[in-house]
Amino acid sequence: ANFTHEWLDNLDRILEGRKPDYLIVQHMEPDHAANVANFLKVYPETTIVANAKTFTMIQNFFGLDLEGQKLEVTNGGTLNLGNHNLTFVFAPMVHWPEVMVTYDSTDKVLFSADGFGKFGALDVEEDWDDEARRYFIGIVGKYGPQVQKLLKVAAGLDIQIICPLHGPVLTENLGHYIGLYDTWSSYTPETEGIVIAYTSVYGHTKAAVELLADKLRSKGCPKVVVYDLARDDMSQALSDAFRYSKLVLATTT
C-alpha cells in the first residue's frame, strides 16, 4: 500500500497536472504490474498498451476488460508519439510468457523489462556484474535460448541507454553488459575455475571436499570455490556454478 501511494505521488509530481495518454505494460509479474488497477482509478482515460497475452492476464488478475481503452500491439509493431517512435519486441519467457521490450528510436533507449536487471540498492556501491549474474542465473538462467533471440534483435538496434525494471539505468559501456548477457545465455563459462558444491551429514563428505580443494589448489588450479549447500547462499552457489568452467557435486549417499 505504501508503495502504491509513493508511485502514484511520483507520477503526479512528474506529470504536473497533465494526464498520461498511454500506459505501456511490458510484464505482468506483480512486482511491476500490481498497481495497474490503482493507476486506472486515478487516470481512467489512459489507453493501456500491451500484447494479447498481457491483456488476458490483466483480465485474470484484476477483472478488467478495458473495452475501449486498450491498444493491442504485435511483435515488431510501432506507436508514434509525435517526438518519439516506439517499437515493441516480444520476448517470451524472459522470463514470463507475455514479456515484451520497447525501443525508443528517438532517444535510442531500450526499455528491457527484466532483462539487464540486478539485485541490490541504488545507494549501495557494488559491482554490477556479480549481482546481475546472480539475478540472471536465478531468474532467467534456464531461458538462455529465448535471451539469445532477444539479443539478436537488440544487435540490430542503435542502443545508447538500457532501462531495466530492476537495478540502475545503464548509460555507459553497454557492450560490456550485452556481452555478459550473451555469455550467460549461451552457457559459456566466464572464468577458468572449479566450483565444488556439497552436502555432508556427518562431516565425511566435507572432509573429502576439503581434501580435494587443497589438492586442486596445490596443482595450480586458478580458482577453487567451495559451497556447503546446507549453509551457504544457494543463489550465489548457483551463480558461480555458471560462472566457472567446471563443477564438482559431492553429496551423501
Where are these regions (language model features)?
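Pre-active-site segment of Zn-dependent metallo-hydrolases
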Residues: 1-23, 46
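Di-metal (Zn2+ and/or Mg2+/Mn2+) metal-binding site signature of metallo-dependent hydrolases
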Residues: 7, 19-41
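Conserved acidic residues
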Residues: 21, 160, 245-246
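N-terminal beta1-alpha1-beta2 submodule of the flavodoxin-like/Rossmannoid cofactor-binding fold
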Residues: 173-253
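A short helix->loop->beta-strand "cap" motif at the edges of active sites that frequently abuts
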Residues: 43-47, 159
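Short acidic loop-to-helix transition motifs that present clustered carboxylates
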Residues: 29-31, 55, 229-235
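Metallo-beta-lactamase
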Residues: 50-172
